[in-house]
Amino acid sequence: MTEPVRFARREDIPGLKALWRRCFPGEPEEAERFFETFFAGDTFILWEEAGEPVSMAALLPCRLRLGEERLPMRYVYALCTHPDFRRGGRAAALLRFAEEAMAARGVAALCLLPDSEKLLRYYEALGWRRAFHVPAGGSGAPGGGDTLEYPEEYAAYDDWLQALDPGEPAELPGLMKDLVPGLPAELHAAMPRPMN
């Protein structure tokens, strides 16, 4: 049986917003702002059950600087599964789909920022490696000084979120998954030193 994973379409947005609000019960306008800012043809993937999304992730475009070269990269954001459908391998299937689909599009790597030690161990068990960190008080978007570049709307969205809930700043480990075989060793050396 093939997995019901696919790229999201415009008509999926209401279901994706409902899933977002169920998994991330913060400010109600957050889902509206996020989808208005980031929805595009290949930026959202979902797992569908009975015509409704039960697991999703955003694959936000960014670039990895490697010397003078700029490599396309995707920032995996808002990976979530409805509580009634957890522990069925759906998130792992979404990540596999993301790896295959983005590699086919020439994307060099995926990155993400797990917000707990439990998630960090989960992603590492799936083959992700620690590659950078976002210092306390830094942007929630992938950082790393001059190593990662992301569009201005990411920073604007992150600033908007911080204004909604300033909270305590935390240092976050960043994980990467290489999609292109034989990426140069400088890729790893260029990334800021990961947290221990």
In which residue ranges do the predicted regions lie?
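A conserved beta-strand-loop-helix scaffold within acyl/acetyltransferase catalytic domains
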Residues: 5-79, 181-196
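Alpha-helical elements of Rossmann-like donor-binding domains used by nucleotide-donor carbohydrate transfer enzymes
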Residues: 15, 19, 93, 97, ...
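Conserved acetyl-CoA-binding loop-helix of GNAT-fold acetyltransferases
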Residues: 78-81, 87-100
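Conserved functional hotspot residues or short segments at active or partner-binding sites
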Residues: 118
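Amide-forming acyltransferase catalytic core, primarily the GNAT-like/NAT-type
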Residues: 127-196
